[in-house]
């Protein structure tokens, strides 16, 4: 009986030892998997693209770099770009992620992008914007609001890029716009896709396109509209309804 009791006591202590050992091992594994960051105060970057006159500048209040990676987490970033000394933009937000390896910047939370080309200035607001510096492409799939001296525009996202002719195009998805002036003769328009070539005074509306001017509603497959002169330049398969 004493022999059996002794064996049981040994087994109990052995079980406790193994349980304690495994617990500590798991804890050590979790500890080793923790991500390490290096923090920097008020960092700055200047990125110049090879064989072009394009340049980008980035400043932030703080930056945290994940160990052994070229990825930075930024607080209160300010981003500026110059495309061949013609197109300029600046952007600010609450947070951002900079990937130097991919040459990409993701800005989030209260993003304000200002685009300037010649005498045209556009203010764009969203909660998230992706900046692809290598391909000179800015885009967002979030709700976007645009404000200019002439109009306001809301859309379900945008895409800014430079086409083969070197012209900057802003493309808006499921967009609607209206004139800033609250007058009887103000205009309103909407379409599945709205294209704005910067700098210009025209919109190209594609897919379920509608323009309302004064007492007339024009619906068409495609409409080219000058928002400065309030004139329709051209349209495809259109019909006019007067109220």
Label every model-predicted segment.
Residues 1-243:
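Mature-chain termini and adjacent capping regions
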């Amino acid at each position: 009986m004493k022999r059996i009791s002794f064996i049981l006591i040994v087994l109990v202590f052995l079980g406790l030892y193994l349980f304690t050992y495994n617990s500590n091992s798991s804890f050590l594994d979790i500890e080793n998997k923790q991500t390490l960051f290096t923090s920097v105060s008020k960092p700055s970057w200047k990125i110049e693209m090879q064989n072009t006159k394009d340049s980008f500048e980035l400043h932030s209040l703080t930056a945290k770099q994940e160990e052994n990676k070229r990825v930075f987490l930024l607080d209160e970033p300010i981003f500026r770009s110059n495309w061949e000394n013609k197109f300029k933009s600046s952007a600010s937000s609450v947070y951002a992620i900079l990937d130097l390896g991919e040459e990409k910047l993701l800005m989030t939370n209260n993003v304000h992008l200002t685009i300037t080309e010649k005498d045209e200035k556009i203010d764009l607001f969203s909660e998230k914007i992706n900046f692809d510096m290598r391909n000179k492409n800015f885009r967002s799939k979030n709700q976007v609001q645009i404000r200019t001296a002439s109009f306001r525009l809301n859309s379900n996202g945008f895409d800014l890029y430079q086409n083969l002719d070197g012209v900057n195009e802003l493309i808006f998805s499921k967009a609607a716009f209206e004139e800033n002036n609250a007058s009887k003769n103000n205009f309103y328009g909407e379409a599945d896709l709205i294209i704005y070539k910067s700098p210009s005074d025209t919109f190209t509306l594609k897919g379920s396109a509608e323009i309302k001017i004064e007492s007339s509603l024009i619906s068409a497959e495609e409409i080219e509209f000058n928002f400065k002169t309030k004139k329709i330049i051209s349209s495809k398969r259109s019909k006019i309804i007067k109220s």
